[in-house]
Amino acid sequence: MMKFSFALVSIAAILGATQAQAQAQDCKYSVPESQLVKKGTLTMSVNPTLPPLQYVDQTGTLKGMRVELGEEIAKRLCLKPEYVRIEFSAMVPGLQAGRWDMINTGIFYTDERAKLMQMLAYEDQAISISTAKGNPGKISKLEDLAGKTIGVELGGFEERKTRELDKQLTDKGLKGMNIRTFENFAMSFQSLRAGQVEVALSIDSTGAEYQKRGDFERVLSGLFPTPVAVALKNKPLADTIAKVLNDMRADGSFQKLFTSYGVKPIDGAIVVKGPAT
C-alpha cells in the first residue's frame, strides 16, 4: 500500500512539473517577482462605475472591456489577475506607494501624469454630458451649461475639464456652473436621477450606455478627445506590458475586443511614456 501511495505521489509530482513546464513554455514574456507587488499576480486598481467598460454586475462580478483587457494581459504573462476596487482619487497615491502594479481604470493620458508614472495610451476616448430623459434643460451646446448644476467624479481629468469649461463660460460673461464632485461616476448619476444635479459628466462610452438603457439622455459628446491609458510605477514591467498589447494588436484580439464594445483603439503602436526610471 505504501509503495502504491508513493507511486501515486510520484506520478502527481511528474504531472505537476510537466504542466508547469508547459505553462512556462506558453509564456512569451517572464516577469521577475521583484517587479510585482504580489508573487505570481498582476494586481490592478479599478473603479468599476463606468459601464460598459468597467462595472459590477448583479452577482457582484467585475465586468467590462477594461476588465477583460487586464485579464488577458495577466494571462499572457502567466500571472493571476487580481483587482482592487477603489475610488479614482486614491489610485495614483496607491500606485506610488506600491499597493498595486497597474492602474487599469481608464486613466486619461496627460503629459503631467507621464512625469509621475509609466503610461501606455491604448484607447481613444472623450467626454459626454448627460441629462434627465427628455433633456428638460434644452441643452444643445456648451453655452447652455451656464448656470447649471453639474455632477462629476472627484480628482480626475473630467473634473479638471469641468473647471476649465466653467472658466470658459465666465470668461464669455456667462454664468458659471455649480460644480458638485462625487467619489465616483455612479454617485454622480444617482444624483442626476434624484434631481440633485441637472447634468452629469462622464466618458463617451458610459454616456452612450446609459442612453441605450433609457436611463438618461446624452446631449453632448465628443468633448475634449484624449487617449486613455494604463499606468504603472515599474518601467520594466510597463515595457513588457507594452509588448503584450502590441502582440494583441498584431494577432487581432485587441481590435476584436474593442469592436465588441464599440470603442476605438488608438492608431499606431502602444508605447511607454514616463520617467526614465
Task: Give the ranges of each region predicted by the language model.
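N-terminal hydrophobic or amphipathic helices and topogenic motifs
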Residues: 3-4, 11, 15, 21-80, ...
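Periplasmic-binding protein-like
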Residues: 48, 124-131, 204, 208-246, ...
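Acidic, polar ligand-binding/catalytic clefts
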Residues: 71, 75, 80-144
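A ligand-binding cleft/hinge motif common to bilobed small-molecule-binding domains
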Residues: 89-93, 106-115, 161-168, 190-224
